[in-house]
Swiss-Prot record:
GO biological process: diaminopimelate biosynthetic process; lysine biosynthetic process via diaminopimelate
Top-rank EC class of the record's enzyme: transferase
Cellular compartments annotated: Cytoplasm
UniProt keyword Transport, yes or no: no
Main location: cytoplasm
Recorded name of the encoding gene: dapD
Taxonomic source organism: Rhizobium leguminosarum bv. trifolii (strain WSM2304)
Protein name, as recorded: 2,3,4,5-tetrahydropyridine-2,6-dicarboxylate N-succinyltransferase
Domain of life: Bacteria
Entry keyword annotation includes Cytoplasm: yes
GO molecular function, one term: nucleotidyltransferase activity
UniProt EC number: 2.3.1.117
Lineage, uppermost ranks: Bacteria, Pseudomonadati, Pseudomonadota, Alphaproteobacteria, Hyphomicrobiales
């Protein structure tokens, strides 16, 4: 699709979103066609909810988030087939794999293990592997990435190339508030089992999160080497584990010192060469 066509599509969706109270399941014509076209482009990976510039800054294409939100108004509830034992679900969003056969899967080039769930408008790149997991609408999963068992990729989340999302990992989805950016895991990251990255936080390229690390917008990210505290973004090639920080001079009602509070701790930083040659377990040893 040309830049002119994309601009026209964006204009139609922006206008429809501004008038969304009048968009419903009976809406036909230009608005429905535009939303369907946007979802198809997302599904095929031809557009993304967020794109990374040469300077490392991420730009959010809000109109694509608006297209996803409008689809909930346009689509009625319907039976979704494909459950075990010929069971069904009841939802507004069909499976990405609806109507797929061998040719579709071979052309797509990724592995989809039984019981993985991918909703329409999510993109899965070639050589990705989906264990029994959940990938929500509008998400992007990059080439060669492993989404391990019971991991969740939230709505519009952006997962880079050659990422490993370990068992039970949660990558948060962000559709609303509209101005919020999606949660982003850049290329070559490892996210340890049962960790959570949410609320539009960014894990930069080559970083390693140990098991059970939780990062939201209000989570303190502490660099152990410098004492620097930051929020919302893990720097490139950081090795991060769960930790805690003293509450300073704060006390409880009984006069005793207040408990320590959770934080994420950057225990070391490695260069690209070291990261590529060193095993994950070795990196996480203190």
């Amino acid at each position: 699709m040309s830049a002119t066509d994309l601009a026209s599509l964006e204009k139609t969706i922006e206008a429809a979103f501004d008038n969304r109270d009048n968009v419903n399941t009976s809406t036909k014509g230009e608005v429905r066609d535009a939303v369907e076209a946007a979802l198809d482009l997302l599904d095929a990976g031809k557009v993304r909810v967020a794109t990374r510039g040469a300077d490392g800054a991420w730009t959010v294409n809000q109109w694509l988030k608006k297209a996803v939100l409008l689809s909930f108004r346009l689509n009625d509830m319907d039976v979704v087939k494909g459950g075990s034992g010929n069971s069904t679900w009841w939802d507004k969003v069909p499976s990405k794999f609806e109507g797929w056969g061998e040719n579709h899967f071979r052309a797509a080039g990724f592995r989809a293990v039984p019981n993985c769930v991918v909703r329409r408008s999510a993109y899965i790149a070639p050589n990705a592997i989906l264990m029994p997991s959940f990938v929500n609408l509008g998400a992007y999963v990059g080439e060669g990435t492993m989404v391990d068992t019971w991991a969740t990729v939230g709505s519009c989340a952006q997962i880079g190339k050659h990422v490993h999302l370990s068992g039970g990992v949660g990558i948060g989805g962000v559709l609303e508030p509209m101005q919020a950016g999606p949660t982003i895991i850049e290329d070559n990251c490892f996210i340890g089992a049962r960790s959570e990255v949410v609320e539009g936080c960014i894990v930069r390229e080559g970083s390693v999160l140990g098991m059970g690390v939780f990062i939201g917008k209000s989570t303190k990210i502490v660099d152990r080497a410098t004492g620097e505290v930051s929020y919302g973004e893990v720097p490139p090639y950081s090795v991060v584990v769960a930790g805690s920080m003293p509450s300073g001079n704060a006390t409880m009602g009984n006069g005793k010192p207040a408990p320590h509070l959770y934080c994420a701790v950057i225990v070391k930083r490695v260069d690209e060469q070291t990261r590529s040659k060193t095993g994950i377990n070795e990196l996480l040893r203190d």
